[in-house]
């Protein structure tokens, strides 16, 4: 698509028609949006009164191995086994599910040629070790406080044997003071870090809850996890392709790095469920079942529908010490570097599920700013895509 766009923009004869077509498309989008109107919003109090109620008698057990776990060089061949190829083809604007897309009457020939090229490069990536897969997992005690989850991070690593690094610094994330853990049924001294989540406010049909991720955490004590993974080593190969003016290989390598990052997130989540947290030790799922998410628990990512506010990545990265643990950093707008990276939270309750927060109102915006510890203008900028 990028090649076609660039060609149209540099064309002496086609650029005006192309720009006019784009303008017409966007005007159509505006007209449709204005015609549809917007769904009614509940007050924040009413939305909270209609919260999802999870059965806390079925909450997950404490982790077998709490704390931080660092993975410096996960086997690329292992990750290749769980790659979900359907999004790979969509990235090339080839519509269809893998492997059926390879025999599709319309795009099958193009998809098959692309698949062959991808497999050839994939083999080189693994054999020549182009990439290094680095990641970190954290599993912490926590509790729910309204629409927030308060994460308890030990002040001293020896309180949680798997916890890595020196004394952890809470920074400024709407954190309470460092308090004795016994206030929350914990041994030792802990930082208490606030994770503010957003609640659905759009009026629902009877029997449908206005959900928030905090609904899956017990007020009386629970556990939450976090992770961040990244694929390192891509850039030198991109430089080589650019020097050779090989745009195709450049794009192909980027697409495969993204697939490795997603596969790493999938593989690590399974390791958490079966071993580190261990609430599903006997899990035996096929790759297809993993893609369909037929497992217990979710891993919502900041910036995605259930957790749309990107700045929570900064709290997550600080909790994980992601820079030192996995070589991952954030830009000022909370984009992850390297770009082939995935991060998110782990919820283990069997009732936990994905949903979209969608539109929220001014009342929740102001409430969120207080809970997040920022001024309203900053919160408004962060939440703009979800505002009324």
Regions found by a protein language model. Give the residues of each.
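Active-site loops and adjacent core secondary-structure elements that bind or stabilize anionic groups
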Residues: 3-251, 255, 274-276, 285
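C-terminal accessory domains/tails appended to large, multi-domain proteins
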Residues: 168, 186, 205-388
